[in-house]
Swiss-Prot record:
tRNA processing keyword on record: yes
GO cellular component: cytosol
UniProt catalytic activity: uridine(13) in tRNA = pseudouridine(13) in tRNA
Name of the encoding gene: truD
Keywords from the named record: Isomerase, tRNA processing
Role played: Responsible for synthesis of pseudouridine from uracil-13 in transfer RNAs.
Enzyme class: isomerase
EC number: 5.4.99.27
Origin species: Haemophilus influenzae (strain ATCC 51907 / DSM 11121 / KW20 / Rd)
Protein name stated in the entry: tRNA pseudouridine synthase D
Amino acid sequence: MLEQLPYLALKTPPKTTALLKAECADFIVKEHLGYEMSGDGEFVALYVRKTDCNTLFVGEKLAKFAGVSERNMGYAGLKDRRAVTEQWFCLQMPGMETPDFSQFELDGVEILTVTRHNRKIRTGSLEGNYFDILLRGAEESDELKARLDFVANFGFPNYFTEQRFGRDGHNLTQALRWAQGEIKVKDRKKRSFYLSAARSEIFNLVVAARIEKSTINQVLPNDIVQLAGSHSWFKADEKEDLTALQVRLENQDILLTAPLIGEDILAASEIENEIVNQHSAFDPLMKQERMKAARRPLLMKAKGFSWAFEPEGLRLKFYLPAGSYATALVRELVNYTEE
C-alpha cells in the first residue's frame, strides 16, 4: 500500500537500504502528554518502560495486579510493540491504597514512576512522542545527506503508514466489504479500525495527488487551510486572497490540509473533491457511524530533527505530534526493511 505512494524528497525512491527495528533498542519512543500528574486523586498513574511488549497486554496485567477491571485502566495511545517505549498508564482506584508495584513482575516491563492523578488518561490525550531511531546498515552518501537536509528543512508527507491498515491492508479490505454490505461488523474495536483505515486511505491518496501534481506547497482555490499551532481552519474561497495565503504558507503561518472524511461532506479543492467522490461507497458508512469530518496537515515537519552516522548505521532523533508516524519520515530517507 505505502509502496505505491510517491516520495517528496528528491521526487524519487531512496537508494539507501537499511534495517528498521532489527533490535528493539533501535526504535525508542518516549511519550509526551503535555501535562503533569497532579500527585493526588482517584487514579494511580504509572510511567512504564516496555521492551517488545504490547500496550494493551501490559495495561491488562497492571489492572490485574491492582485488582481492578480492565475498564478502569487507561492510556493515551498504543505504542509499537517491537521497540523500547515509555508511556503512562492509569488505574481508577478511588478510596483504595496504591498497590506496591515494586512487586509487579512482567518480562520486558519496568515501572519507572508511581504517582496519583485526578482524572483518567484517555486515548488521544497526548501531545506527541520523542523518537530515537537507529537505521542499521544505512551508509553515508551524498544522496542520503540530501534527503536528510530536505526533511529537516521542508518536512515529509504526513502519510498514514502500515500500522493504520493492518496486515496486508486487511482493515481497508474489510472496511470496503462492510461499506458494500458484504459483512456486518459488531465488534466496536473492529468498526473503529475499519473506519480509520478507510479515512486514512483517502487522506493518503489526496496527499499523493498533490505531490504528483506539484501542488503540495501551493494554495489552490477552495483549499482548506489550518492555522499553525491550532486546529482552526478556513477555506481559501473567493473571499480570500490566494497570493496573500501563499505568503502565509511559506512563512509557516498556515498549513495545507487533506480530509479525514465523515458524515458531513465539505467541498474543497478540485483534486480533493475528485478523490473523495471516487470513494463515495464509504459515505453511507460514515453517516451510519456518525463520524465527524476532520482535517489533517498534508506535510509534517519534525521538531528537534537531528542525525548522526554511527558504525552501525544512521541515528535519527526527533519529535512528532500525536497522530504522525515516524515511519512516514523514515521512508523519505531510506528503503527500509522491518525485522
